[in-house]
Regions:
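N-terminal, intrinsically disordered, polar/charged segments of Gram-positive cell-envelope systems
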Residues: 1-18, 161-175
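Short, acidic/polar N-cap/turn motifs at the starts of alpha helices
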Residues: 13-17, 24, 103
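Secretory pathway targeting signatures of secreted, lumenal, and periplasmic proteins
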Residues: 22-85
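Short, surface-exposed beta-strand/loop "edge" segments at domain boundaries and coil↔beta transitions
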Residues: 26, 64-74, 114-115, 121-131
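Short, solvent-exposed coil/turn segments at beta-strand boundaries
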Residues: 31-32, 108-113, 119
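Extracellular/lumen-exposed scaffold segments
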Residues: 89-90
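Short, surface-exposed beta-strand/loop micro-motifs that present aromatic residues
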Residues: 97-108
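Surface-exposed amphipathic alpha-helical segments
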Residues: 116-175
Length: 175
């Protein structure tokens, strides 16, 4: 018997589900990413000084770059803000624009606002074709992962979210 596999989403059948507790959320990632990515969860992440400005949930890294230099390889981070913390940090930010350096409001639920945070500088190894190829693959495949994150956790999609290299709103798909 298939455990919760969507008929309309065969390619996602081979997934690893990661979860965090504060807030309780899950992220389904393709099993194939095991070879090319490192995913850190809240429990693995040393909360930076920014923790007061939101809770880091998940971080995706390209494996070749990250194993060479832990300051490299970041593809994106998912961050949850309470509504108050969000307002304190960003004020009355326009959710249809990129906020901060490169942050995108993916959606919200009754308690939190969820941001996709992209690095502002090059994160793959520029002299390494494998790193570049894998980095681009992770960016492309993140669309399904991030859309799934919103759907699986019943997060209301920010329909005005600007397009990023990792995520675009699929208009009308989750009405």
């Amino acid at each position: 018997p298939s455990m919760g596999a969507d008929e309309d989403n065969q390619e996602a059948s081979e997934v690893t589900i990661l979860s965090v507790d504060q807030p309780a959320l899950s992220l389904s990632i393709p099993k194939a990413w095991e070879d090319i990515a490192i995913i850190k969860r809240q429990t693995d992440i040393q909360q930076s000084a920014e923790a007061k400005d939101g809770t880091l949930l998940f971080q995706l890294y390209e494996k070749t770059a990250y194993t060479t230099d832990e300051a490299m390889g970041n593809v994106w981070s998912l961050v949850a803000f309470t509504k108050d913390a969000f307002k304190e940090k960003f004020g009355d930010a326009d959710l249809a624009t990129v906020i901060g350096v490169e942050s995108y409001v993916l959606g919200s639920d009754s308690d939190y606002i969820y941001l996709l945070v992209r690095p502002s500088d090059v994160q793959f190894l520029e002299n390494d074709d494998t790193s570049l190829k894998q980095y681009k693959q992770l960016q492309q495949e993140s669309q399904v992962v991030l859309a799934g994150f919103l759907k699986d956790n019943s997060i209301t999609v920010n329909e005005d979210c600007p397009n990023s290299s990792c995520y675009k709103v699929a208009h009308g798909a989750n009405k």
